[in-house]
């Protein structure tokens, strides 16, 4: 595997996330319904758009991503973002799965007022993303400000017929989480649910 510096890997991962999750048309590629992009076409279109991208760089990003954001097709000819899509081109068909008793959602404290009103919604993405552990949720929440960890009563939701799916990188997905299925134990005292 070729050597790349951390900035180059991070920049490429962000570029791939943008193109493979949100705006494939920004460089002129089309994703299939399962989110797959032809690697040769991706590289060519990225280079035409001024982005330095090679197969070796892709291989390194896919292999070293701590969150396993991307995967290759079994024949190695296509790549996709594992989850997190907002583009209408993609509708990955995940297998429904029974969740553990609790899952976790990391968010920034500035979003809590809205969450208290409407629960967790997918927003521009196709699903609400949940973590199996608090540490991962804390990292996610810290990306947007002072992190707050919300506990989701996942098994209770599933017992009421609300479906869950799990992406191949371990991220749990659901359509929405109503306020009644949220626990707020890690909130600052001034932000406690009324």
UniProtKB/Swiss-Prot annotation:
Gene Ontology MF: a single term: NAD+ poly-ADP-ribosyltransferase activity
EC top class, as a word: transferase
EC number, UniProt record: 2.7.1.-
One Pfam family named in its UniProt record: PTS_2-RNA
GO biological process: tRNA splicing, via endonucleolytic cleavage and ligation
Keywords: NAD, Transferase
InterPro entries, per database record: Ptrans_KptA/Tpt1, RNA_2'-PTrans_C, RNA_2'-PTrans_KptA, RNA_2'-PTrans_N
Family assignment from sequence similarity: Belongs to the KptA/TPT1 family.
Task of the protein: Removes the 2'-phosphate from RNA via an intermediate in which the phosphate is ADP-ribosylated by NAD followed by a presumed transesterification to release the RNA and generate ADP-ribose 1''-2''-cyclic phosphate (APPR>P). May function as an ADP-ribosylase.
The protein's name in its UniProt record: Probable RNA 2'-phosphotransferase
Source organism: Escherichia coli (strain SMS-3-5 / SECEC)
Lineage: Bacteria, Pseudomonadati, Pseudomonadota, Gammaproteobacteria, Enterobacterales
Gene: kptA
